[in-house]
Amino acid sequence: MVNNCVDENLKKRIRTCLSNLPITINTSYGDPFQPDQWENTLNKIKYLKEQNYQGEVEVSTKWILSNEQIDELYHANPNLWIMCGITGLNEGKGVTLEDRFDNYLRLCKRFKRTVLNTRPLIPNKNDSMDILTPIIEVAAKGNKLLKHGGYLDPSNSKNKKTKYDELRKEIHSLCVKLGVDDGPRCSCIVTDVTGKINSTYEDSEPKNLDVLKALGFDFEIENGFVKLIGFRNSGIITKGDVSFARLIIESSHIFDNWTDSHQYMQMKGPENQTLVCTSSWFHWAREVPCQVGCWYCHVKPGTAIYFVAGDSGCSPIDLYSMLFES
């Protein structure tokens, strides 16, 4: 539905906001670089480039890429963020830890925004420095960027990620010694590298409130914080709505008052597809059966966290076109 009640100056600002959202590609169910997903992932990256998309673009993967694929990917977008998964949990038949180390280092040679992603850390599985030290040492040989995080039980959508405060200190201590940046979130690492605002931690007055309203979000301001009260008079707030609004206002000054814990948004895409937003990324994904086979996966069909089958998301610029262009 086209919104004709927005003036041209505001439209320009809305387009700028949407075209600067951080976006993750094909990180739903199915690895973005597995054979039956490779072309789709590559096409999405190229499409964003053709649109002159200004936001950070990311893929999370545990797939082993050939040098030819790395070259093709580099030509599509040399500034791509690649979260390269190495957990020590032996995912994928016939893939050794050394194979994963080699894959990571080859990616680092071409992509300066390759991050070694050792997530999840699962209690009594890979949550020890005996397992993590060799992984961190390899991160130090690459781009010196490390992401780690807790385990989310796929059988319970209301569970939070496991905490590992003491281990976190040990990881950080070794990272400091080796010169590795182990930002607590993807968004922290992105900010460290690019200098862009990290909405999760930005302690400042909310911006773009007129943009948020024009996009259909109902909200109040309470003690300087945005308090969502619904979307287009729905009276419902999802976790995805809050995450998306936080990215728009470029501030942490928003209440986590969601009434639905799923990451999907109430806004729909140009083809009425589900839209998904997490704390760090807006999602654009095609769902395919995953060929990596992570036994701990929390987004595969049948888990409590899984919400809806099929494709989700779109280019945010296409979202703008749907809402504000005839």
Residue ranges, per PLM feature:
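Short, electropositive alpha-helical surface patch
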Residues: 44, 79-83, 126-146, 193-212
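C-terminal accessory extensions appended to soluble enzyme cores
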Residues: 155-326
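Conserved radical SAM core fold
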Residues: 23-34, 63-67, 80-95, 118-125, ...
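Conserved C-terminal portion of the radical SAM core fold
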Residues: 99-156, 170, 174-187
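Conserved non-cysteine loop/helix-boundary elements of the Radical SAM core domain that shape
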Residues: 3-5, 29-37, 89-105, 122-133, ...
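Conserved Radical SAM active-site core
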Residues: 1-81, 279-287, 294, 298-326
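Short amphipathic alpha-helical segments and helix-helix/interface helices
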Residues: 15, 41-49, 70-74, 101-108, ...
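Hydrophobic beta-strand segments of well-ordered beta-sheets in folded domains
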Residues: 20-27, 55-59, 79-83, 112-116, ...
